[in-house]
Amino acid sequence: MEVILMERVAKLGQMGDTVRVKDGYARNFLLPGGKALRATAANKARFDTQRAQLEARNLELKSEASAVAEKLDGQAFVIIRQAGETGHLYGSVSPRDIAEVVTAGGFSANRNQIVLASPIKSIGLHEVPVHLHPEVVATITVNVARSPAEAERQAAGEEVNVVEEATMDDLGLEVGAALADAGGSLGDR
């Protein structure tokens, strides 16, 4: 399906571009979100008459997003989660969780603006991009910890005590050493 982009869409094009996309992408994402119009003669004429208004609105939204990005960029947010001794979370931190914390911190963000390659599954400091506008990105720091005290230590730059996972080789050496200390070996039995 051919569509006319009403705003800049990442990896697709700029406002006013006519692009060919898959039908499902257009029907489920671009058209309902107001990001595109079907590329018909009537819609092309309508877009040409409204182009100046759309560009002005886009500039206004971009300037608002830039103002928010200046305040938001570099902010740190703390998320408390349960984790094992190795530092792996019992669940994960998703874009929805981060958006809730950012909103509670006094900023406006929804889960679609938070972009994670994969959910956060370990404690520590994580850099997370927030796409406030197609052309404006702010980076925040998400501090995932087991307790508020641990979060403060992580923020101060201290290394949190995380027990390293034991490998099978380590376990075999430990068992062998314990048997040697006991005076026996596996072959003696």
From Swiss-Prot:
Keywords for this protein: Ribonucleoprotein, Ribosomal protein, RNA-binding, rRNA-binding
Cited InterPro entries: Ribosomal_bL9, Ribosomal_bL9/RNase_H1_N, Ribosomal_bL9_bac/chp, Ribosomal_bL9_C, Ribosomal_bL9_C_sf, Ribosomal_bL9_N, Ribosomal_bL9_N_sf
Entry's Gene Ontology molecular function annotations: rRNA binding; structural constituent of ribosome
Pfam family membership, one: Ribosomal_L9_C
PROSITE patterns (UniProt xref): RIBOSOMAL_L9
GO CC terms: ribonucleoprotein complex; ribosome
Cystine pairings recorded for this chain: none
Gene Ontology terms describing biological process: translation
Keyword rRNA-binding: yes
Domain of life from the UniProt record: Bacteria
Function summary: Binds to the 23S rRNA.
Family membership: Belongs to the bacterial ribosomal protein bL9 family.
This protein's name: Large ribosomal subunit protein bL9
Organism: Methylocella silvestris (strain DSM 15510 / CIP 108128 / LMG 27833 / NCIMB 13906 / BL2)
Organism classification: Bacteria, Pseudomonadati, Pseudomonadota, Alphaproteobacteria, Hyphomicrobiales
